[in-house]
């Protein structure tokens, strides 16, 4: 990958300033700049499995994927470069976690797109560091300050939950639909009938709400859940545990870590990567589903009605049907037959 994001391009304008720095990169790292940046030493921590996949090719064991960063991730770093995400609670969780371990006096750089709200980093960190804007370009802001005081951090305080049809849904910052069931997932769930059976794969599981609701009225299903997000993986595990449900939950970039075949694959695939519209994950889902569905197995997804999934479903599977729709969303179903492109 050679193309850098606007945020990385702004950082590169200051590359000479980092030659002697020992840098910890974190946040929404959507390119491989952390692995190519010229500095004295570099490490990275990410909550996104696909970012870990990209960075580990160059950084190897100097990049780690997990929900919470540990002291070993910070090691002897004297500089934090943080890529601001689109989700403010996610930024709060990550920055408090990282800065609770970074040494007082360390340099803090926060970079991100203006429309993602990067400016709020100033107020968020005001108690711990005074940030000043030092550059503005490519519709991004770059802020710098030094750590005056370490915050305290307790990951347990960031957990949230909501109730849905007698189920407890556990959530964390950065998890999709953290505050309640989204309308797309609600529409998808409305298409399932009780007593569904077989092996179910929930791709992009978020807080595990689809699987939990499905298993609550179809106890014979065998659940497998995956997501690229560490908070989502942990939230899904907690959701299943809170409701006495069992399932295999793990991190995967769509099908990258998935093995075997399933009777049903369900998903409410994301179409935003950061602040940009991205169809890549859903296209990978549809194209890859043929390798993970048994004969007669079905793919059932919900998507914004304007997205061009019908054409792709027809191209790969030979047909599709619309099970439910509103003005904004459609639930698509297709089945693994001999005519599917394997």
Curated annotation (Swiss-Prot):
The enzyme's E.C. designation: 2.1.1.172
One of the record's GO cellular component terms: cytoplasm
InterPro entries: DNA_methylase_N6_adenine_CS, Mtase_sm_N, rRNA_ssu_MeTfrase_C, RsmC/RlmG, SAM-dependent_MTases_sf, Small_mtfrase_dom
Broad enzyme group: transferase
Localization in the cell: Cytoplasm
Annotated disulfide bonds: none
Keywords: Cytoplasm, Methyltransferase, rRNA processing, S-adenosyl-L-methionine, Transferase
GO function terms (MF aspect): 16S rRNA (guanine(1207)-N(2))-methyltransferase activity; nucleic acid binding
Catalysed reactions, semicolon-separated: guanosine(1207) in 16S rRNA + S-adenosyl-L-methionine = N(2)-methylguanosine(1207) in 16S rRNA + S-adenosyl-L-homocysteine + H(+)
Subunit note: Monomer.
UniProt-listed PANTHER family: RIBOSOMAL RNA SMALL SUBUNIT METHYLTRANSFERASE C (PTHR47816:SF4)
UniProt function note: Specifically methylates the guanine in position 1207 of 16S rRNA in the 30S particle.
Family note: Belongs to the methyltransferase superfamily. RsmC family.
Record-given protein name: Ribosomal RNA small subunit methyltransferase C
Organism from which the protein derives: Enterobacter sp. (strain 638)
Higher taxonomy: Bacteria, Pseudomonadati, Pseudomonadota, Gammaproteobacteria, Enterobacterales
């Amino acid at each position: 990958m050679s193309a850098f994001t606007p945020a990385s391009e702004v950082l590169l304008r200051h590359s000479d300033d980092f030659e002697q720095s020992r840098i910890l990169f974190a946040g929404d790292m959507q390119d491989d700049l952390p692995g190519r940046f010229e500095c004295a030493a570099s490490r990275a921590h990410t909550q996104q499995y696909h970012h870990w996949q990209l960075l580990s090719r160059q950084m190897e064991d100097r990049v780690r994927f997990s929900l919470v960063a540990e002291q070993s991730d910070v090691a002897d770093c004297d500089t934090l470069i943080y890529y601001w995400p689109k989700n403010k609670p996610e930024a709060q969780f990550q920055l408090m976690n990282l800065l609770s371990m970074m040494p007082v006096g360390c340099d803090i750089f926060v970079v991100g797109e203006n429309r993602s709200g990067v400016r709020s980093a100033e107020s968020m960190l005001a108690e711990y560091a005074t940030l000043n804007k030092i550059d503005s370009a490519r519709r991004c802001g770059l802020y710098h300050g030094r750590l005056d005081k370490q915050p305290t951090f307790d990951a347990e305080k960031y957990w949230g939950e909501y109730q849905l049809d007698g189920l407890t849904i556990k959530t964390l910052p950065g998890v999709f639909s953290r505050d309640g069931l989204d309308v797309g997932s609600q529409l998808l769930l409305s298409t399932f009938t009780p007593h569904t059976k077989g092996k179910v794969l929930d791709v992009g599981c978020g807080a595990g709400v689809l699987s939990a609701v499905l298993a609550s009225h179809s106890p014979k299903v065998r659940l497998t859940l995956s997501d690229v997000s560490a908070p989502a993986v942990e939230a899904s595990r907690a959701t299943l545990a809170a409701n006495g449900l069992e399932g295999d939950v793990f991190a995967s970039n769509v099908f990258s870590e998935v093995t075997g075949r399933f009777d049903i694959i369900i998903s409410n695939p994301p179409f935003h990567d950061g602040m940009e519209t991205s169809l890549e994950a859903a296209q990978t889902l549809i194209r890859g589903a043929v390798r993970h569905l048994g004969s007669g197995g079905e793919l059932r997804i919900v998507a914004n009605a304007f997205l061009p999934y019908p054409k792709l479903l027809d191209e790969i599977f030979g047909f599709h049907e619309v099970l439910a729709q509103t003005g904004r969303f459609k639930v698509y179903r297709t089945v693994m037959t001999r005519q599917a492109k394997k």
